[in-house]
Amino acid sequence: MKIAFLTAGGIAPCLSSSIGALIEQYATLKPEAELIGYLNGYRGLLLGKSIKFPESAKNNFSVLYEFGGSPIGNSRVKLTNVKDCVERGYVKEGEDPLKVAAEQLKKDNVDILHTIGGDDTNTMAAQLSNYLKENNYDLTVVGLPKTVDNDVYPLVQTLGAWTAAEQGAIFFENIVNENTTSTRQLIIHEVMGRNCGYLTAQTALEYNNSCL
């Protein structure tokens, strides 16, 4: 059995630990499984660039819980943006990125693909799975939803959101402490959130709780 991983979309403080948790489970449930990671998300899949996880990773997975980022890289490449994929040299003119990615998964004999990302990442993963099934290749896709916005319905909590709020509150606390050096400072702490107000609200709550 071959298991593949990729991380894609916007960064969030959960990519490394998510991979670590998956390795931990496979080391227990399927120790004989071969684990690979596509480098820099869907870009690596399109270009056929991957790395094989050494057997030692199955015993040393806990180190991934200590770091942010992604050990296999990340990108925002979208298989549905054909023009961008062609311009960047990920596929040739006239090629369908979805088909190129699917054929690479077949070539690599991948049985299970774990996609760690947001809506776009996991929607594309589902499209890949459907394409392969239509072409008589059975691939199981497991999507792990991560976003600091915590706006993936119907999930109550997405990966990365809590940590982002916690760190935002710590940052604000440090800045507020600096404000005691002057009586003529105005601090505006802007928190991202797109059309969702979760991160702003949760960051404020975390800061308020730290002051109690």
Task: List PLM regions with ranges.
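Active-site-proximal loop->helix
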Residues: 47-51, 151-160
